[in-house]
A protein has these predicted regions:
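Macrodomain-like recognition of ADP-ribose-binding/processing modules
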Residues: 1-133
């Protein structure tokens, strides 16, 4: 029942197909909108180090939106990955999961740096690693 409900909700918002967008370079697309409606190979999630999604109800972060509309299976897959790994996901690293109820095929989860006070060169390098991984 969850799957039918989530797919219907996403369809109501309208699916955006990558074939209707223009690449900024071969195979790379830059698009602004609701990432949970994008039909493509993979979307990127700004994840936390636990990798199991945001736990603040109705929080408007990308992590919560992706986990909520993908369905509970995504949290279960991320939990399984993290249990095998036995530690939090390091900043700048990435994991790939199935997308479940989202129109894309995969989700790339990457953990960005937490900038407390002042941006440092290490913060910049950690963020660059998110894109490289």
């Amino acid at each position: 029942m969850q799957d039918e409900y989530l797919k219907e909700e996403i369809n109501k918002k309208g699916i955006v197909d990558i074939n209707n967008l223009n690449p900024i370079q071969k195979g790379i697309y830059l698009w602004q909108g609701d990432i949970t409606t994008l039909r493509c190979d993979a979307i990127v999630n700004a994840a936390n180090s636990a990798m199991t999604g945001c736990y603040l109800p109705n929080h408007r972060c990308i992590d919560n939106a992706i986990h909520s509309f993908a369905g509970v299976e995504l949290r279960l897959e991320c939990d399984e990955i993290m249990n095998r790994q036995e530690h939090g996901e390091p900043t700048g690293q990435a994991k790939i999961t199935n997308a479940y109820n989202l129109p894309c095929k995969y989700i790339i989860h990457t953990v960005g740096p937490i900038i407390s006070y002042k941006l440092t060169s290490e913060d910049c390098e950690l963020l660059a690693n998110c894109y490289r991984s």
